């Protein structure tokens, strides 16, 4: 198919419509999935599988082209005078490929998971639509088109978060949307400023354009990193993740955790390691100072994120909530690697190798965790780990795959997490040796501490679910049959085992054939790229490092178990939501109330001031009447006064009716949107494909996003 779509080849730059086709197929296909579901649910499910599988094929085509040295591009129609394009280098194609493949596995896992769900057509519709937005993020050549796909993904995924429509799901969905709006507006503001100061929004090295912008360069970096940081789960912008994961269906949680948060990381990568770097021609210049400062900050954001989230994961009893905090912690590892790459600047290839490898690894073992736990959840409908246990005999293939995922995230040698965590450890050590700053020495120690905490909370999760005595209520739910997995679930589990084992046993092949070629469009010193290529993780020093982390983890587990600290509940005031977001919402509420009160009082002054104006006018007319006008003049004035009084009364009555009607319409609109929550009705179409149940929050989002896009793109960009 790729050969058919080739339009022109110029050296290693290939103009090709394949990126656009790859995105349009799931976006348009989602409509087909929804329409078919009105007639035949099974056909709708089958089409969803076919679309996701075909997307894997298309992304594989782009990956092979990029692996052979080609960069695919396709120019999109300009938006408000801003050129947009799709551009696929090896980095984007790798992200798109593992995204599409894991999405395909999640769609397969969704077949048995959603088999008896009345809203499964809506679920598969938005699942495929979100796939289009997510893949589109990785195939863009500029930040504006990336933003549009980013927002499409955000809005479509909302339906996955609130799918169960429980009280907790709706609350989690509201927080997800509100933070998504804030992140989107922050990102858009940064893009607007970037275009204003550089004249372009292309994803390419622009440090030479940004160096003389003063504080604008700092502001652009803050706005764009914060915008992507919301989706990446960066502390303190992470609070939607622990709320969304427990309430979403397990396959959707796998995608939220394993894939969608990678879109945020991808955006930060493109900012820190590309946008804020000089081009290759200026690589030896002194333009790296700003990049180094950004990298230093990102290192510590990553360290804080990984450590705090790991501590929170240790204290969770809800398995899905534990995995949510685990995802935040692992994103901290990735952010630390991005920061190390930025801090090292031209010599940052090791950081690039570490965070890239860990992004791929985390996508597989974390998606595996959620999908595998979903197999158990469909039988038991239980997420409290205290009520689970002894399940390894009932779910043998799930148990084996879960063990492989656990070994991967712990960093046990021979599994995928070991290689990427070792490269990340090398990167933070190199960052310390770059300038020998004491805080980076401390960062390396906290890295090791967090690795130990990771071992601790994963051991808690694994042991609580699969070992111990089988609970009586569990045995009643499962019955006496030996195994509870169906064929599709076993196939998905075995695929996770094979991929994680391959990524762990062949790190040299991954680095030499995938990771190192991915550095080509980035500005890195060839010496350090070759150093990354020759780095071996199978040496006594690195093995000793992971042994220390494993020993710390075992020690933490024994300590927490004996002291009965695994169920310890932290006080509310240490919560970011309690101590930061709730006060911020209250302050904003007070501010908006005062502004509204001022507007209302001003309107009242105008409203009540009109009679005073009329009275003063009457006095003036009376004076003229006595001194100047004759009898006919007085009659004329009296007629005018009566006409004015009549018009005034009519105006007052009209205003009152307008206020009454506006209030009535607003109340009706609010109550209608408020009642949009799903209620079972006799009409099967309403049950199957009721999009309106996304409640008042989506209405707000659509209005805000539409208004912002319309005003900013049509006026600011012109």
What are these model-derived regions, one by one?
Residues 11-21, 85-98, 136-148, 290-297, ...:
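Membrane-entry segments of alpha-helical transmembrane domains in multi-pass membrane proteins
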Residues 256, 475-478, 484-506, 510-706:
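Membrane-interface and transmembrane segments of multi-pass membrane proteins
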Residues 19-26, 44-58, 92-99, 123-130, ...:
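Hydrophobic alpha-helical transmembrane segments of polytopic
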Residues 9-13, 209-211, 285-291, 353, ...:
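Membrane-interface segments at the starts/ends of alpha-helical transmembrane spans
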Residues 710-718:
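Juxtamembrane boundary at the C-terminal end of a transmembrane helix
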Residues 105-115, 121, 131-146, 156-484, ...:
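Hydrophobic transmembrane alpha-helices and their helix-loop junctions in integral membrane proteins
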Residues 2-20, 31-125, 200-208, 281-284, ...:
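Transmembrane helix-loop-helix hairpins at membrane boundaries of multipass inner-membrane proteins
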Residues 2-6, 72-80, 202, 206-208, ...:
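Membrane-interfacial helical/loop segments at transmembrane boundaries in membrane proteins
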């Amino acid at each position: 198919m790729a050969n058919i779509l080739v339009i022109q080849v110029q050296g290693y730059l290939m103009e090709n419509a394949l990126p656009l086709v790859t995105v349009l197929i799931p976006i348009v296909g989602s409509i087909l999935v929804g329409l078919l579901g009105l007639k035949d649910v099974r056909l709708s499910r089958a089409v969803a599988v076919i679309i996701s599988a075909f997307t894997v094929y298309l992304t594989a085509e782009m990956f092979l082209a990029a692996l052979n040295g080609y960069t695919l591009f396709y120019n999109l129609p300009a938006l408000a005078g801003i050129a947009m394009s799709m551009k696929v280098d090896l980095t984007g194609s790798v992200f798109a490929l593992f995204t599409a493949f894991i999405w395909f596995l999640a769609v397969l896992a969704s077949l048995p998971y959603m088999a008896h769900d009345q809203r499964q057509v809506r679920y598969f519709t938005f699942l495929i639509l979100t796939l289009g937005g997510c893949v589109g993020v990785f195939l863009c050549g500029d930040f504006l088109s990336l933003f549009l796909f980013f927002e499409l993904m955000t809005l479509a995924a909302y339906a996955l978060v609130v799918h169960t429509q429980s009280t907790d799901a709706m609350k989690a969905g509201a927080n997800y949307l509100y933070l998504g709006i804030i992140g989107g507006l922050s990102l858009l503001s940064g893009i607007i400023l970037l275009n204003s100061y550089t004249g372009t929004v292309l994803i390419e090295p622009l440090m030479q354009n940004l160096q003389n912008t003063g504080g604008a360069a700092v502001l652009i970096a803050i706005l764009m990193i914060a915008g992507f940081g919301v989706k990446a789960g960066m502390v303190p912008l992470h609070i939607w993740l622990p709320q969304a994961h427990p309430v979403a269906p397990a396959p959707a949680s796998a995608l939220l955790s394993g894939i969608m948060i990678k879109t945020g990381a991808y955006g930060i990568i493109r900012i820190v390691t590309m946008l804020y770097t000089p081009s290759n021609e200026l690589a030896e210049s002194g333009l790296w100072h700003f990049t180094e400062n950004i990298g230093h900050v990102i290192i510590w954001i990553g360290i804080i994120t990984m450590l705090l989230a790991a501590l929170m994961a240790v204290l969770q009893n809800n398995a899905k909530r534990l995995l949510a905090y685990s995802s935040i912690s692992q994103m901290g590892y990735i952010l630390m690697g991005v920061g190390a790459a930025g801090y090292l600047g031209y010599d940052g290839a090791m950081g690039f190798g570490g965070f890239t490898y860990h992004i791929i690894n985390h996508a597989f073992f974390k998606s595996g965790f959620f999908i595998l736990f979903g197999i158990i959840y469909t039988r038991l409908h239980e997420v409290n780990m205290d009520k689970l246990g002894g399940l390894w005999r009932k779910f043998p293939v799930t148990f084996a795959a879960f063990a492989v995922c656990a070994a991967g995230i712990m960093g046990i040698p021979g599994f995928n997490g070991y290689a990427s965590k070792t490269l990340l450890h090398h990167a933070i050590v190199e960052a310390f040796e770059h300038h020998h700053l004491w805080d980076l020495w401390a960062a390396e120690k906290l890295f090791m501490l967090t690795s130990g905490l990771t071992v601790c909370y994963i051991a808690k999760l694994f042991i609580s679910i699969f070992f111990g005595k089988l609970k009586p209520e569990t045995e009643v739910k499962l019955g006496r049959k030996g195994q509870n997995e169906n064929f599709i679930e076993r196939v998905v589990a075995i695929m996770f085992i094979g991929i994680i084992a391959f990524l762990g046993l062949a790190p040299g092949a991954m680095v030499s054939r995938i990771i190192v070629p991915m550095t080509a469009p980035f500005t890195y010193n060839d010496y350090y790229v070759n150093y990354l290529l020759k780095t071996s993780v199978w040496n006594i020093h690195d093995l000793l490092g992971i042994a220390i982390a494993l020993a710390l983890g075992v020690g933490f587990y024994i300590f927490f178990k004996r002291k009965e600290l695994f169920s310890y509940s932290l006080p509310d005031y240490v919560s970011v939501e309690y101590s930061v977001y709730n006060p911020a919402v209250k302050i904003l509420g007070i501010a908006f109330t005062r502004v509204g009160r001022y507007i209302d009082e001003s309107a009242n002054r105008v409203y009540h001031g009109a009679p005073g104006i009329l009275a003063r006018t009457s006095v003036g007319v009376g004076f003229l009447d006595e001194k100047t006008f004759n009898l006919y003049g007085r009659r004329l004035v009296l007629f005018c006064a009566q006409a004015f009084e009549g018009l005034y009364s009519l105006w007052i009555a009209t205003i009152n009716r307008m206020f009454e009607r506006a209030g009535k319409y607003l109340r009706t609109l609010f109550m209608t949107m408020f009642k949009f929550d799903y209620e079972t009705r006799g009409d099967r179409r309403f049950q199957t494909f009721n999009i309106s149940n996304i409640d008042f929050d989506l209405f707000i989002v659509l209005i805000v996003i539409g208004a912002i896009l319309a005003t900013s793109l049509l006026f600011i960009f012109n």
